[in-house]
Amino acid sequence: MELEQMVVKELGISMDDLRELIDRELEKIEFVKQRKAQLLEMEQLVKQKEAEVDHVDKLFDNATRAVDDCETLVKSLYDQIGMTYKESSSEDEGSSKPTEVIEIPDEDDDDVMSVGSGEAVSKIPKEKHLLREAMAAMKRSRQDVQSIVEAIQKKSDGPQTRFSSHPSSPTSSVGGSNQASASNDMSKDGDLVVGMRILGKKRTKTWHKGTLISIQCVGTGKKFKVKFDNKGKSLLSGNHIAYDYHPPPENLTVGSRVVAKYKDGNQVWLYAGIVAEPPSSKNKMRYLIFFDDGYASYVTHAELYPVCRPWSKSWEDIEDVSCRDFIQEYVNAYPNRPMVLLKSGQLIKTEWEGTWWKSKVEEVDGSLVKILFLDDKRCEWIYRGSTRLEPMFSMKTSNASTQEKQQAGQQRTRPNVGAIRSKGPVVQFTHDLTGNEPEHNPAAPPSPQSMPSPQLIDTDSDSQQAQSKKQVAKKSTSFRPGSAGSGQSSPIPTESVPQPPAAPRPFQSNQSVQPVQSIQPIQPIHNIQTIQTIQGIQTIQAIQPIQSIQTLQPIQTIQPLQTIQTLQGNRIVTSIQQFQIIRTENIPAESTYKAPKEKLFYLPHVCNYTCLSRIRPLSHRGKNPLLVPLLYDFRRMTARRRVNRKMGFHVIYKSPCGLSLRTMPEIERYLFETQCKMLFLEMFCLDPYVLVDRKFQPQKPFYYIPDITYGKEDVMLSCVNEIDRTPPPQVAYSKERIPGKGVFINTGADYLVGCDCTDGCRDKSKCACHQLTIQATACTPGAQSNPMAGYQHKRLEECLPTGVYECNKRCKCSANMCNNRLVQHGLQVRLQLFKTQNKGWGIRGLDDIAKGSFVCIYAGKILTDDFADKEGLEMGDEYFANLDHIESVENFKEGYESDAKSSSDSSGVDLKEDHEENSGSEDQEESNDSSDDNFGKNEDITTSSVWRSYATRRTTRGQKENGTSETASKDSRTRDETTDCKLPEETSKNKVASWLSSNTMADSVMDSDSRSSLKMGEALETDKPKESEEASKYPRFAEGNRAYGYNPTPTKKDGVRRPVTKTALHQIKRQSSSAQPTEEVLTLSSSSDSEVGSGTNGSKKPAAQATANDSDDIQTISSGSDEEEEKKNVAASAGPVKRQVAVKSTRGFALKSTHGITVKSNMASGEGGPGRRNTRQFFDGEESCYIIDAKLEGNLGRYLNHSCSPNLFVQNVFVDTHDLRFPWVAFFASKRIRAGTELTWDYNYEVGSVEGKKLLCCCGSTECRGRLL
C-alpha cells in the first residue's frame, strides 16, 4: 500500500488509471494484436471442433440404433428359420473361437457376404422376402458404419475410444477393421513412395524440392506430407506436389499441368502453370507456359516438372478467376487461338492499369511480344492473344456487342463486320504450330453423284441448297477504315456480304510418297480425293484419273447461248440454256505488240484536232486499255533519272505529233485540245513498274469459254478451268443493278444535280458534281472538307467513306471527255474467270493494273432486308452485299470508335516509312513482313528481366498486412541482391506515377471530365509521405535492370509471389488511395469479383502539348454509373430495334468472352442526343439497309474472293441517282497488280459473329487472319 501511494504521489495518477494506460499501450503493440487475433481464431476453432464432435456423436448414436434394429431383425430371422443367433464379440462365450461363415445363397447366386461368426447354415430360408429385407437392412447398416468411420477419423481420441469399446454386431466388425486400416499411414500410393524426392507447393505459391515422408488418408482422398530441403513441412494434396524429373515430351500436351522455372535476371523460381504451346521450329523448340498468376514465358524441356495428381480440368486448380477463365477458353479453343499479328517497329496501343498507352513493338518471340511503352520507356512481355493489346480488345468487345444485341433482339443473327482492319496489327487465328492439328469435322461417306466440283467450298456453285435455321451472312460495301487502299485510319462500323471460301484441305491419297530418284514420264494419277463442304457436311469425291500430258484430250471451248427473258406479272424472269461445248485444240493466240522502229520528231505547232485525224477510227476495242494508246501511235518510253542521289525510273509519252507528255496534267490537256474521244485518261499510266505489254497466258485448261458475259460487257470476260472439268455456275449475267420486289430507285434527271462544265470538269472548284464529293467529306470528324477529294486523273488513290459523285445525264459536259466519269463507262480492264485450287472460282487480271484504277462493280438484284432474310434462308447468303453507305458515314462522323487509329501516331502504324518509291525492284516494294519471320529472331536465347503476361489485366485495391502494403494479386518476393544498387532520386518512384500526377493536376482545369483525375491526383499527393517508408521495405533495382508487370489476380494474404518493382510500389500507392470508387473507373475484373480500381480518364500531356489528339495517345477504358444511360443513347441513336447487322456499338455492355470487361467511350463527339433520328428513317421511316444479291443474277463482281491482304478496295459511287440508299458498289485497285494475279477484296467478316458457323481463310497472305467466320 505504501508503494502504491508513493507511485501515485510521484506519477500523479491513480493505479487504476495507470493500469488502463498500460492496457491501452499494450493493445497498440503489433505483437499483442497478433496474439489476440490468434487467440480469437483458436477459440473459433475450438468451438468448431466441439460442434463437429457433437455432430459425430449424433451420427454415432443414430448408427448404433440402426445396428441394433438390424440385429433385432437378424435375430427374428434366425428364430423363424430355427437357428440360434450368437454374438461374435461376447466374451463369456469365447470370442477367440475361429469364425465361421454364414452363406446365404441368393436366387441368382450373385451375392456372398461374410456377416460374422456362427454355425454353418443347414437350412435354406423358405421365405425369400424376409431374407431380402434382412440383407437390405445389413447393407444400410454397413453404409452407416462406413460414414461413422470416416467421421471418427476427424474427431478426437475420446470418441474413438468410445466407439471401439462399444459392443459390435456382426456387421459392425467389418467397419471396425476398415477403420483400423484407414487410420494407418500408407507407404506407397501408385508411383509415389515414401522417401522419394518430390516438389511441393508452399504458401508463397512457389514450389520447392523436398522429400515425401508420409502418405495419409484424409476423408475420401489422400494427403502427402512433404519435408522441404530448406526447412518446413507441409501436408499437401496430390495436385500440389510434382515429380522431381522431367516428363517425356509425348506427355506434355496443351493443357498439361506442370511446374516450370521462371527466370528474372539472376533469380529463378518454380511456379505452377499449364502448357500452352508445344515446341516447334517457330518457337525454338520451347514450351510456352501460362503461369497461374497471369504471366507467360518460354521454357525448355529441362525446366519442366509434371504435377503428380493433376485435376482432369487443369484450369480448375487456378485460384484467380480471370486467369482460370482465360485458360479454360484457351484450352477449349486450341489449336484455334486468335493472336495479334505483329512485327518489330509497329506502333500499337497497349493497356496498363486501365489506360491505353502508345507503345511500340520491340521484339516478337513466338507467341510473345516485347512492348515498349513510349511514355516512360519501360518494357513488358505480353502474350499476343491478350486483350491488353488493342486489336484483340476491339475484336472481343465487338463480338460481345454482337452477342448482346442478338440476345436483346436488336440485331439479326448475321456476321457483324464492323471490326477494324488496321494496316499494321490485325488479329490472326493461328493453328497448331506442329502442323498436327486434329481434324474436327469428320468427313462423310463419298458421294460422287452429288459433287459437281472438287473444291472445298465452291462459293459459286448452285449445288449449295438452303439449310434450316441457317445464319445469314452479308458482306459490306461501305468504307473499311485502315484496309488496303484506304487513306483513313479511323474506325467505322460497317456491314457484311457474300460468303467467302473456306480453308483448303489437302488432297488425300492412299499411295505413300516415295523419294524421287529420277525424272520419269508422267503417269496417270489415281485415287486422288478432294473434300467438299456442302451445307456443313463434308463429302469426298474421287477425281477421275488424270491422263499423262502426252495423252490429254483436246480442251473444250464452251460457247454460251443467249439468255431468254420473259415477263411474268411484274417480274422479269431470266433463263439460260445450257452451255454449248465445242471441241478445239488450243486457246486462240493473241498477237504481240511490236513497237515501231521509226522515231517521232516534234515540229513546233499548236496541238489541235488534226494531230489525231489519221487515227480516229475506233478499231481497238477489247484490248488492254493501257496498250490502246500505243496502238494509236503513241509511244511510251521509260528513262532513268537521278533524284536525291538515287537513280529512279520515269515514264514519258510521245504523241503521234511528237509532243512529249511527262505528267498526267499534260496528257489531260493534250487529250482535251485534240478532242480525243477514243482515248480516255485512264488509259495512260506513268508508273514505271506497270508494263503495258505483259500478257498472262493460262496453261492448257480443261475448259475454255471465250466470253461468259454474252457480249453484255464492252470487254470479253473469258473463263478457264485448269483444275478439273467442272463448268462455271449457271448465272444470268447482268452488268446493271436489278431492283427487286418492293424496291424503287428514282433515276429521273429532275432529282439529280448536274454541272455546266465545258472544260471536261478539270476544274473541281467550278464543277457542281465535284463539289458534291468535296462537300460530303465535311461529314468526317473535324467537319473539314477535302478540296482534293474525288478522282485524280481518272484514278482513285484511296477510299472516300462519304462517296464519290460522278457526272450524270443532267450534266452538260461531254461524256467522253469528262474527267469525272469513270465507273459509268463500265468494264475496261481485261479480266478472266478461273478455277482456283481451293477457293472455288475467282477473277484475275490478264494485264497489269495500275494503282487506283477502276476494275468493276458489284451488280445483282437489290432486295429489302426482310426479303433478303427470307431468301437467304432458302437460297443461301453467299452473295449478299449490304448497301450500308448511310450507316457507315453516320458512324464515321459521330466517332463511334473513340479509340480508333485516326492519325499516324495511333495503333497499327509502322515507324519505318518507305520513301523510295521509284527505286529497287517491284518485288521488293510488294513484299510484306510477317510476325512469323520474326519468330525466334535472336538465335541466343537470353533470359529477360522484363515480366511477361497473358491474362486480362485489371486494377485492384491494395491491402495492408503486417503494416506493409502488398500488390493486388501477386505475392511480392524480395530478392537478394549481391550489391546494394541505389536509384537516382527522380526514379525512386515510378515515372508514370509522377507524369500522371503532375500533368493531371496541371491540366485539371482544362479537362472536360476531370473528376476522377482530380481524385487520383489528390490521392497521390496524400501518399507521397508514405512512399519512402514503403520503398525502404522493398529492394532497390538499378535503372538498367527494371522489371515491370501487372496484377491480374485479387489480393492474397499468403506469402510472396513475384519480386517487387517500382511499378508495384506505384500500384500499391494508387490502390491504397482508391478506397472510394470514382465515377470513371476501369473494370477489367472477373464476373465473380466486384473489385473496382481507379484509373485515369483522358489524362493529358503537358500544357504546351495538350491537344484534342490526346485521346489518341492515352485512353481510359471506363465503366461508370452512367452505363445504362449510354446504352439508351446508343439504342436511340441507332434507330428502331429492327436494325442492320453491321452497325457496331462499343458502349456500355458486358463482355463475357473476356471475363467481365466493360467499356465506355470517352470521346465527346460520340455522344448523340437520345432523340436524334437515323438518316435512313427520313426515307419513309425505313429501318434497315437494302441488300444486293448476286446469287442468281449478277456480274463478275460475285466471283471476287476474299483476302486478308486484298488488292482491291470498295468505293460507293453515285451515278444514276443521288439517293443515299442506292450507290453503285465499285472496286478500285489499292496497289499495282501484276498480270495473272487474282483480284481480291476484304470481306471483313467478324470472327465468331455467327454461332455455329465457321469458315477458315485460305487466302495465303502473310497477314492471313486464319478465319473468316
UniProtKB/Swiss-Prot annotation:
Residue ranges that the Swiss-Prot or TrEMBL entry lists as coiled coil: 9-63
Enzyme class, spelled out: transferase
EC annotation from Swiss-Prot or TrEMBL: 2.1.1.366
Keyword vocabulary terms for this entry: Chromatin regulator, Chromosome, Coiled coil, Metal-binding, Methyltransferase, Nucleus, Repeat, Repressor, S-adenosyl-L-methionine, Transcription, Transcription regulation, Transferase, Zinc
Domain MBD: 620-691
Bias (Basic and acidic residues) ranges: 968-989, 1021-1033
PROSITE patterns assigned: MBD (PS50982), POST_SET (PS50868), PRE_SET (PS50867), SAM_MT43_SUVAR39_1 (PS51573), SET (PS50280)
Record's protein name: Histone-lysine N-methyltransferase SETDB1
Gene symbol of the encoding locus: setdb1
